Amino acid sequence: DSQMLRRQIGLIGQQPTVFPGTIEDNMLFALNYYKELSSADRKAKVIQCLEQAGLYSEINGDMKRLASSLSGGQQQRLCIARSLTVDPRVMLFDEPCSALDIKNSLHIEALLRELKVKQTIVIVTHNLQQAKRIADYTVFMNDGRVVEWGATEQIFSHPQQELTRDYLAFGG
């Protein structure tokens, strides 16, 4: 069932994709589609996910604010919070911090470390230090092929493949 599969996977792109309308509209989008909850339970779930993403206090609980008025980092966290509303088992991130400043990047990284305790997190990144800080396992790819994979600490401290060693020496 493709609908059930879609509900199990959250996708966060490189550039935040906020929907037209308010923060609340964005947060209720998937929740209204995939979950049958009372109005009170929907509101509680929205607040919980915004808090988890570290955004609720920053917007002072103003969910009627336009989503497009948020900063880039806030929009990225809104997208993460929106995905969390349906409790996905897997979250896929494509360069989640590439367009963010260091403060917002560190906030997103902290959130990803928290999320990976309960969900499977897959991150595509060219940022080696970010991979080292977040990932439990790393897959190093070149030209669409797996060069090496294993525990992140092992890959970064004792890479087995020459291409991995060369890449880490250049950028790691």
Regions found by a protein language model. Name each.
Residues 87:
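Conserved catalytic motifs of ABC-family nucleotide-binding domains
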Residues 149-150:
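ABC ATPase "signature
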Residues 2, 25-41, 56:
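ABC-type ATPase nucleotide-binding domains, specifically the catalytic core motifs of the NBD
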Residues 65-70, 74:
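Conserved ABC ATPase signature
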Residues 40-60:
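Conserved ABC ATPase "signature" region
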Residues 91-94:
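Catalytic Walker B motif of ABC-type/P-loop ATPase nucleotide-binding domains
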